[in-house]
Amino acid sequence: GLVLCVIGVIVSPQVAFLLSQNFWLGILAGVFAFGAWGMGYNLSAVSYLSLATELSGENGRGKTIAVMWFMMIVSIIATAIGLSRMVDPYTPEAMMRAFNMVGIAALTLGLLGLLWLEPRTRADSAQATAEAYTFKQMTEAITRNPVGKTFFVYLFLLLAAILGQDVLLEPFGAEAFGLTVTQTTRITSIWGTFVLIAILIAGALEGRVAKRTVAQAGNLGALAGFLVIVASGFVHSTSVFYTGVTLLGLGTGIATVSNLSLMFDLTVPGEVGLYIGAWGVSNALSRLAGSVLGGVLRDAVTQLTGQALSGYLVVFGIEALMLFAAVLMLSRIDVSAFRRQAEEPAFVEKVALAAE
């Protein structure tokens, strides 16, 4: 998974330049690059989260997630700062060189992190084999569990909104306020800094405040961030925009830790991989939806209105509505009810037991 992600990162800037020279060849290269990244991300994420669930224990999951995402956001901030310097002054060669360096650094750190992460024993191998689940099994496990279905949709809406803005904030800053490449690159650093602060806050609240309460606070913070960013486009104010970025960062950090901790709780002992795999499917679908919102829909609205800014504002507005729907759904998610429903035999199993 890591190797596929690195290949996608290194090839992606070349795809952007190739599209302007040979459109169809660029599309083909784009399918390869982003397909490799997507497959690599999902291969890595599901196994990584399953391992984190098993190693952390129920009481330490919030702190484990806080540490995981703390390190991830630190790397995002460091990468954003490094990229802003490596591409200044901007040239296509500088951009490709910067992406190559990021890819090599990620591969090196990732391989070092894998050393002794999961000692292999025969028992481990047998358990890994026993926990190989099909897509059909994951689908059945979720569809027969009402709380599971609600959480699947909730996670989809939440992540699609939060992840969908990832590719929009920087070009929006350039379009709405005329920010330079260096200035827009630093938007990620600002956002990441407040995500980092929020992760530390969420980690400190672990065990002191109910997870759903913390998750709802994060969801509402991110929702407020989107609304303020939309407002900044109408009033043409960079100070309002940066306020929205700050709120979005704080909300994203709190929501990330608390919702992932909640996701880890929504598993059943002995079938952790089954449910983490199902939540991974929701994550993958949310990334697809976020990409469609950030790319296809934005371009479609821009073409219809003739104004590039309108495309961004419409997408941010839709993402705010998705977060609002997620806020309403969170109250229906109960861990105890989920586990009771997960452990209850399916209808076919009940018939078989009755026949015996």
Regions found by a protein language model. Give the residues of each.
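C-terminal ends and interior cores of transmembrane alpha-helices
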Residues: 1-24, 220-236
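A membrane-interface helix-boundary motif in multi-pass transporters
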Residues: 20-25, 84-104, 296-323
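Helix-to-loop junctions at the C-terminal end of transmembrane segments
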Residues: 87, 198-213
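Juxtamembrane intracellular "pre-TM" segments in multi-pass secondary transporters
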Residues: 121-152, 341-356
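Short amphipathic helix-loop junctions that connect adjacent transmembrane helices
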Residues: 167-184, 299
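C-terminal transmembrane helical hairpin of 12-TM major facilitator-type secondary transporters
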Residues: 213-259
